[in-house]
């Protein structure tokens, strides 16, 4: 039996070639886990003769799945790689749900509600005037129950208090309402696929379809996802799970790092292989990371090591306040940039909470440092995209009341509040969807003539788009729809600033282009399938990693990334670790979050904290984080004790570099 042709270390090679049963790969930060998954797929297909169509690799983000597909195509060739299922958990759940929708009580053309739409449904089901924060909390609780694989019919087992009991009663109404809309939320993609797999015939069908399963970022799985994997892997455990218990930082959204141990309990024959050689960071960074995370309990110990040399000492910088901290970071970036230590894109500034970014942005702008702030408004949350997506959702699923209400009078077509109220009343009386009510002459007969005519034209347009989108070219149907509603003219009326208008028009063009690309990938699919795929996406190709800019992002957002130079701001008590997490007993997860931040650095790492920070309009004294005490003193280089002199040097250094920039640009 031949072995993988690409160069692997001994532990990676063992993980790739092991097929004797279920396997857990404990892959430390920067140890090449994605490489192992790619090479194992190649090994299974080319060396073990398993058809690519029988192999599935599951990850958490569209970006990771896309990267995996591209790397597989480079190793297997496009034709073989296309046969392999590479998807997110939610995409896989969508495949199962769509294949067995009748068994689960759904009709064709299921809509997938995003977070905003789902929250709107919850708001409408709660008493009028319910505070927005209560709506958000109720929706979050429903999500937690679903992530724990609790269905609305489970006899209130999820409720732990009187408040939760009320939300549990809401759960059944919410589930019924979504079923009437022929819609699901993102959590349902896992929960409903679990329901389908309870059927033995369905389960056997999928176990035959997926003969080997590989799972990335396994430590981030929640209860529902774990059960899904168990059902697909079967009793013999045709599974390789790759994860790192030290990087489990999503407990707040249901992730259970204990799922690593549960694998051993459920599969006594489980093989465990550790990947401990780090290919990213220098030795000093790894020694600090190892020392920090050693304060957390471990079922299986591992210590990262590197052959890249020691690198720079870790700098710890006390600052007077957050403004001095931001100025210091900006000045240090300028210094490294202009002494040949790297380009703008080699620097990242990480922090615990989004609220820390404002003062950092200001400092970078003052020094004319180009930067990119991660975590802005999602493409699909933009008004123009939500409008057009709702038109298309309604075209493939006329039961989607949420979509109907958003677009029936957008752009304005003389269907006012009173007319919409009449349609809603008629729909409620006859227990039908809003769109079906709008198509009925008896409903429209009571409306003003102009409103009735507009509503009839609207319904005809939606029906025609749905029909053409399935029978003919779906992209032409989409373009004709957008032209027919004169959406571009509507945007021009609604948008005052030319720059903003052009951005919104470009977003519309990008949406059509994205649909075109999806259609070209699978030419035989109609609009219903295209919409299902599009609804699962969270970002577009145009949201590529920014080049040539300093990156500002939260610690959570930095996971999976690496940078030559990393600044970790706000390493203070009540911030890192966060006060709320300490109150909830989550100190270990906060330590893992710090560990993730440290291990993003390749060559240099700077940790900073403020001695006071402005909170709620007042200056509050801050203490250095307890995590600093857990780092070996010999690895740290503390900046001088005289803060005022240090801050003066910081300002002077920044001023010198700014003058250089002015000279460079001829100012």
Question: What are these language model-derived features?
Answer:
Residues 1, 635-667:
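Acidic, low-complexity intrinsically disordered tails
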Residues 25, 29-37, 41, 52, ...:
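Helicase P-loop NTPase motor core
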Residues 2-3, 20-23, 41-211, 237, ...:
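A basic/glycine-biased coupling hinge at the interface between accessory DNA-binding modules
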Residues 4-20, 224:
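N-terminal pre-P-loop "Q-motif" helix
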Residues 31-34, 219-298, 302-307, 425, ...:
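Conserved helicase motor core of SF1/SF2 NTP-dependent helicases
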Residues 29, 210-221, 225, 245-246, ...:
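Conserved Walker B
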Residues 21, 50-54, 81-83, 117-118, ...:
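Short glycine-/polar-rich loops that comprise or flank the Walker A/P-loop
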Residues 160, 212, 343, 357-369, ...:
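Conserved helicase C-terminal RecA-like lobe
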């Amino acid at each position: 039996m031949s072995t993988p042709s690409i160069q692997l270390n001994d532990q990676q090679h063992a993980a790739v070639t092991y097929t004797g049963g279920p396997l857990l790969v404990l892959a430390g930060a920067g140890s090449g886990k994605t490489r192992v998954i790619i090479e194992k797929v190649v090994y299974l297909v080319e060396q073990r003769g398993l058809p690519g169509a029988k192999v599935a690799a599951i990850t958490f983000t569209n970006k990771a799945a896309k990267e995996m597909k591209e790397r597989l195509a480079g190793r297997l060739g496009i034709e073989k790689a296309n046969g392999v299922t590479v998807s997110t958990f939610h995409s896989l759940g969508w495949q199962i749900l769509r294949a067995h929708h009748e068994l689960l009580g759904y009709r064709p053309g299921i809509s997938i509600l995003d977070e905003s739409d789902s929250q709107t449904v919850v708001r409408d089901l709660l008493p009028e005037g319910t505070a927005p924060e209560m709506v958000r909390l109720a929706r979050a609780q429903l999500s937690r129950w679903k992530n724990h694989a609790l269905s609305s019919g489970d006899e209130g087992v999820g409720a732990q208090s009187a408040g939760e009991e009320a939300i549990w009663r809401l759960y059944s109404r919410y589930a019924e309402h979504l079923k009437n809309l022929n819609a699901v939320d993102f959590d349902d993609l896992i929960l409903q696929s679990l329901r389908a797999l309870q059927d033995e015939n369905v389960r056997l069908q999928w176990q035959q379809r997926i003969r080997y399963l590989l799972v990335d970022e396994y430590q981030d799985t929640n209860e529902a996802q774990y059960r899904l994997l168990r059902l697909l892997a079967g009793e013999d455990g045709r599974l390789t799970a790759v994860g790192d218990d030290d990087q489990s930082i999503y407990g707040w959204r249901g992730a259970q790092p204990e799922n690593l141990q549960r694998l051993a309990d459920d599969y006594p024959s489980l093989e465990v292989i550790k990947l401990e050689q780090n290919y990213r960071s220098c030795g000093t960074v790894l020694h600090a990371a190892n020392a920090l995370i050693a304060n957390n309990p471990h079922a299986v110990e591992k210590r990262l090591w590197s052959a890249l040399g020691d690198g720079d000492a870790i700098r710890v910088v006390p600052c007077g306040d957050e403004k001095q901290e931001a100025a210091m970071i900006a000045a240090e970036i300028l210094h490294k940039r202009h002494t040949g230590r790297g380009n703008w894109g080699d620097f990242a500034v990480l922090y615990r909470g989004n609220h820390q970014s404002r003062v950092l942005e200001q400092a970078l702008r003052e020094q004319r440092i180009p930067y990119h702030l991660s975590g802005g408004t999602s493409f699909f949350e933009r008004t123009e995209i939500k409008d057009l997506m709702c038109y298309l959702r309604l075209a493939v699923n006329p039961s989607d009341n949420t979509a109907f209400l958003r677009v029936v009078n957008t752009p304005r077509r003389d269907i006012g509040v009173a007319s919409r109220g009449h349609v809603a009343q008629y729909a409620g009386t006859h227990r039908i969807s809003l769109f079906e009510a709008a198509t009925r002459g008896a409903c429209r007969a009571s409306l003003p003539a102009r409103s009735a005519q507009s509503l009839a034209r609207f319904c005809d347009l939606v029906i025609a788009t749905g029909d053409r989108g399935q029978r003919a070219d779906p992209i032409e149907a989409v373009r004709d729809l957008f032209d027919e509603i004169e959406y571009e003219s509507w945007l021009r009326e609604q948008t005052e600033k030319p720059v903003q208008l052009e951005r919104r028009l470009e977003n519309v063009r990008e949406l059509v282009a994205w649909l075109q690309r999806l259609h070209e990938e699978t030419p035989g699919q109609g609009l219903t399938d295209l919409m299902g795929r599009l609804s699962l996406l969270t970002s577009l190709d145009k949201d590529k990693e920014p080049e040539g800019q300093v990156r500002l992002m939260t610690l959570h957002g930095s996971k999976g990334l690496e940078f030559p130079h990393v600044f970790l701001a706000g390493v203070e008590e009540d911030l890192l670790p966060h006060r709320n997490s300490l109150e909830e007993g989550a100190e270990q997860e906060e330590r893992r979050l710090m560990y993730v931040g440290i291990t993003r650095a390749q060559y240099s790492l700077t940790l900073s904290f403020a001695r006071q920070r402005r909170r709620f309009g007042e200056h509050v004294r801050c203490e250095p984080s307890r995590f600093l005490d857990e780092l070996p003193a010999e690895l740290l280089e503390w900046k001088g004790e005289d803060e005022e002199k240090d801050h003066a040097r910081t300002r002077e250094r920044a001023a010198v570099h700014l003058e250089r920039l002015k000279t460079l640009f001829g100012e």
